[in-house]
């Protein structure tokens, strides 16, 4: 093997090890949350020494930020790969199904909306913010198209729809259904999609609720 071949092999091995580290980080984030995981936990999960781990990531903050960036890259790639003729609501439904299945496989951490420290950490990463804004703009356009077609409620602001949609990606009901409801992954995904896009009230109940407003 020549020098270039050895360098390529070394780069590939480094990338594979980095992917394994990020996979382990996602699992630990889902199981323990940001505040409780340590670099020791990650090293043990991957089977690396801490010095080897620090060759890839200098801190827990760097590691978690990279895991979240990889998650956004995956969502952007999935959304971009959907058929061009797929309707806007079906695009939202398909992306949410992908996110839920990734999460159920242990690959998706809870979104850090409840952690001020993690929010501040991520907003200081230009690479993360750039991707988050890009995904938000793309989905905002999808929601606007869906409202124009009458597929989503026109009286709801886009932000209300989008932030409710984002919340479904980290809804604890997913874990409750798996642990206490004993549902399999397909059933959990189907039920979560139904709640998000169809709601829990019948059409008649919804009309009554609109008429009965608090005084």
Model-assigned labels for residue ranges:
Residues 1-32, 36-45, 62:
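Basic, helix-initiating cap at the start of DNA-binding domains
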Residues 33-34, 65-66, 173, 201:
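Short, Lys/Arg-enriched C-terminal cap helix and immediately downstream tail that follows
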Residues 73-76, 122-149, 159-167, 171-174:
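Amphipathic alpha-helical packing segments from all-alpha helical-bundle domains
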């Amino acid at each position: 093997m020549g020098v270039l071949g050895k360098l390529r092999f070394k780069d590939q091995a480094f990338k594979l090890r980095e992917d394994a580290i990020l996979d382990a980080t996602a699992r630990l984030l889902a199981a323990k949350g940001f505040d409780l995981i340590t670099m020791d936990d990650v090293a043990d999960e991957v089977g690396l020494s801490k010095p080897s781990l620090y060759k890839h990531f200098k801190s827990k903050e760097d590691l978690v930020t990279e895991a979240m960036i990889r998650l956004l890259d995956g969502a952007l790639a999935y959304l971009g790969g959907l058929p061009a003729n797929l309707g806007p609501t079906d695009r939202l439904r398909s992306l949410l199904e992908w996110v839920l299945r990734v999460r159920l496989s242990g690959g998706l951490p809870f979104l850090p909306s409840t952690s001020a420290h993690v929010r501040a950490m991520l907003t200081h990463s230009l690479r993360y913010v750039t991707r988050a804004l890009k995904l938000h703009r793309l989905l905002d356009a999808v929601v606007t198209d869906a409202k124009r077609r009458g597929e989503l409620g026109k009286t709801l602001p886009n932000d209300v729809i989008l932030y409710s949609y984002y919340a479904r990606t980290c809804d604890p009901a997913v874990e409750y259904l798996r642990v206490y409801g004993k549902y399999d992954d397909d059933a959990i995904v189907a039920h979560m999609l139904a709640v998000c896009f169809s709601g829990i009230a019948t059409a008649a109940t919804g009309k009554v609720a609109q008429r009965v407003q608090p005084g």
